[in-house]
């Protein structure tokens, strides 16, 4: 099954939850333990003191990985000067596992699409290899989050690839290739305003606004019934109304 066959509303909801994941990562950027826990403890313990840079939706040729986490190692025993993690996030309504990736057609399509995204994104860096530069450890990771509560259900960390790259050049490449609209959204400090802006960005806000509130619908229905009653009374024959009035008077 291809993900292109999913309804547009499901894709928009997925985009909305991606933005929520990005916001959480930014909030944990200064806390290695919380960031590592949120992403499945994929970072080794020797990077606890590393400086962390985070980039979102970086365009690398035909591919746009969801998130790139760049860690500058300060461990003198580390064979790599830099560790670069490419993340692909998938969100699901229900729980996802390795078993569901094999048997659930949607989870399987998400997983395979994520693998292609990661593979091609990392391969894009090969054109910038420099023989006498420092060694990088480039690691692809795919994560499945449940939309309710942003719970990490399942992740897969793949073997890293060694590449020799210029830190200043690659860091600048990542920074300038980020999606500007996403950066603007993530800069909103207030969470309520951020949530509303994300809904508007993903077109969810306008879809919900098209539905009139229930109270408005009830009020409108009542008004219509009152108008209908008045119209019936207006159209009724006058002599019939008078006879009815006389009968009511006699009963009294």
Curated annotation (Swiss-Prot):
Keywords: Host cytoplasm, Host Golgi apparatus, Host nucleus, Late protein, Virion. It is found in: Virion; Host cytoplasm; Host nucleus, Host nucleolus; Host Golgi apparatus. Residues 215-252 are annotated as: Disordered. Residues 237-252 have a biased composition (Basic residues). InterPro entries: Herpes_UL24. One of its GO terms (cellular component) is virion component. The keyword Transmembrane does not apply. Induction: Expressed late in the infection cycle. May participate in nuclear egress of viral particles. Plays a role in the dispersal of several host nucleolar proteins including NCL/nucleolin and NPM1. Since deletion of host NCL/nucleolin negatively impact on nuclear egress, UL24 supposedly acts on this process through its effect on host nucleoli. Belongs to the herpesviridae UL24 family. This is Protein UL24 homolog. It comes from Human herpesvirus 6A (strain GS) (HHV-6 variant A).
């Amino acid at each position: 099954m291809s993900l292109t066959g999913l309804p547009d509303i499901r894709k928009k909801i997925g985009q909305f939850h991606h933005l929520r994941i990005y916001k959480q990562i930014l909030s944990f950027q200064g806390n290695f333990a919380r960031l590592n826990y949120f992403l499945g403890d994929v970072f080794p313990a020797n990077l606890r003191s590393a400086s962390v840079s985070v980039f979102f939706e970086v365009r690398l040729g035909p591919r746009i990985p969801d998130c790139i986490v760049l860690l500058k190692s300060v461990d003198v025993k580390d064979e790599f000067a830099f560790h670069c993690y490419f993340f692909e996030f998938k969100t699901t309504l229900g729980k996802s596992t390795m078993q569901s990736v094999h048997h659930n057609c949607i989870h399987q399509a998400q997983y395979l699409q994520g693998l292609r995204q990661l593979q091609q994104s990392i391969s894009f860096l090969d054109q910038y290899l420099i023989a006498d530069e420092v060694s990088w450890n480039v690691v692809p990771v795919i994560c499945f989050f449940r939309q309710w509560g942003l719970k990490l259900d399942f992740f897969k960390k793949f073997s890293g690839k060694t590449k020799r790259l210029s830190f200043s050049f690659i860091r600048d490449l990542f920074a300038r290739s980020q999606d500007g609209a996403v950066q603007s959204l993530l800069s909103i400090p207030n969470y309520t305003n951020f949530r509303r802006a994300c809904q508007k960005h993903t077109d969810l806000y306008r879809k919900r606004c098209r539905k009139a509130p229930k109270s408005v619908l009830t009020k409108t229905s009542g008004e219509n019934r009152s108008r209908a009653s008045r119209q019936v009374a207006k159209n009724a024959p006058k002599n019939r109304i008078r006879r009815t009035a006389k009968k009511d008077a006699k009963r009294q």
